[in-house]
């Protein structure tokens, strides 16, 4: 693919992927952790994650996917990032490029995340999006968030606060874009998206309050791999087939640093968080073969080849495969799949 020009093109999560951004470990962030034992086991988890990246990069290369990587900004204990309503001791680990950036249509959106720790994440990816922009892609952002504490004084007010959204809170499926009921995408964020992308019909998935990629994955038109029942999906999906998996019950690990971990365990089912290379190949966490082989067989019964990815650090980090790989270009177009 030497003649491939990097441009944003994303209307789904299942057609052939041509380019993507793969995360990178910022090793310096372990120095944020004062307790030696916690620092040591966090280091071990990050080493495991680095191996996961190596495996993921090989898979992507095998499928001729053009890959970019962020440039981690080293932690400096003598530096603080002071904003009017909060201050940061570091910049978030750039392990999950999908969290801070939404690729939709021909545009990359630098999102206004609900997490303060993500405020300066864009610095580590600027070289990537500049190249896409120079090649003709659009590059935008919602209003810069203030994270004024008053906005958290009661949930209703937060819901109508400044536009706040995370990248995985939007899942395009042709000419519609699925969104959650709230928390990681509030009402003003929905209005902002509708005005920026009028070609999409933004449709809410009932009972979802977190990143959609940890509730379900659309494997191909007519087929969903899901941890939520079919009745929660919009009526448009009533004739689609569902491969259902129960949410795995486990005790969430201790949060040692929000610059390294995601703490939304309540709204996350990592089992479903896989990545489609195309409609016939799906990357899935390796532990699924050990603990849920029947689910793997169900997916494969639909003509989809499942590719195992070792990801033992996923629970500690609360990150899945679609968190660490952000597809920037797929073959899909603005289609009506319904």
Where are these regions (language model features)?
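The feature marks the mature, well-folded catalytic cores of soluble enzymes
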Residues: 1-338
